Amino acid sequence: MTSFTVTYRQSKCIEVKSNGTSYKFYRIPYSLLESGKHGIVPDSKFVVYLLKGKDKENRDCLYVGTSTNGIENRPTSHGDKKVAWETCIIFTSFDPTFLNDSKIRYIEDRLRCAIDETKEYINTTKSTSGKGTNDYDNEDCDKAMPYILEVYDVISTPGANFNETF
């Protein structure tokens, strides 16, 4: 297990610190994300998001995506698919300059691969591209991936509560 500390914040997020870097995770009901009534403004416009929901056969589905413009448009553009999205988990950084387009694409690709490996979910992500990243960015992301995966697993568990007030 990876060593990290978790702090619950009043800003509807959890802060995860490891190796001197801090990240934010938000869990937002998809209905609030769609309506824009979630009250969340991430510090960084670069985000990786994970949508959780059920398809028409009641199977668990996940979608991994990225946005270079925050959370207002891209995560909500999946409402017309054949999945009833229930939750959106947002990953971003406290430092608005730490994440960039290549890093979030790399993290997106790694998360998609991890979902495929579990075989527990229907992965509705068509394809991802971790290409275009440089060795320095990859190294930063590789250091963070073990606890990113652990935190996603914990906060995506139904009933997990980290002082949400929606």
Predicted regions, residues:
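Conserved catalytic cores of phosphodiester-cleaving nucleases, focusing on short active-site segments
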Residues: Y63-G65
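Boundary/linker segments flanking structured domains
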Residues: M1-F46, K54-D60, N69-F166
